[in-house]
Amino acid sequence: TYEQFLDTHARHYNPSNSYITLYGDLDVDRALAFLDERYLSQPSAASRRMDAAVAAGEDPSTLAPNPLDVQAPVTCEYKRIEMATTPENALVGLGLVLGSALDRKRTIAADILFEALLGSNEAPVKKAILAAGLGGNVVSYTAAESMQPYELIMLQNAQPGIARELRRVFQDACRDLCEHGVPRERLEAIISSNEYDLRQRDYGIADGVAIACDALSTWLYDDDAA
């Protein structure tokens, strides 16, 4: 409802629930003083609502931002969603939780590993899935900017009823690589490419925005070192 929309906006979009970044060659003390005078030291609508709730004997937590809790991994055997599209547009996905947003090394390592396994038609796991004739193409994506980073593997132009078979082929291919190893040259090439990208930070946006987004990917989840 409209009232729920207003309530959600008041809970989350206010200075007490904000993250502020400063970037560039500026007078930090002057910038902070300006922010404090204009915004941070002034009672916000959210704080006034909270004070009114306390004065009325109400539970102030009902006006606080909604909590974001870590969820236990869920093993979903099979979930099907019907969509109004042609069969050629069918997608089958496989998602894997990588850990915590605070474990950046693990997330970067997982991104490198999945690039080695699925990043090209010659990548061993992608090659195995395509050879099985389950669909037209395989793409993977590492979602690192969340509380629980995850890897999403998607099979495009999927054949009917192959969801469980996709999981089996994926797991068998990974099991084989655990026994025989991932080609060292491939891993070294991907590590070098990732190192270059991380150093260059060429994301097509302003440097300050890129750095702020990178910091927020863990700062939002209580990483004081961000």
What are these regions (language model features)?
Residues 1-65, 82-109, 115, 121-226:
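Charge-rich, well-structured scaffold segments of protease-associated domains
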Residues 77-80:
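Membrane-proximal cytosolic interface modules of multi-pass membrane proteins
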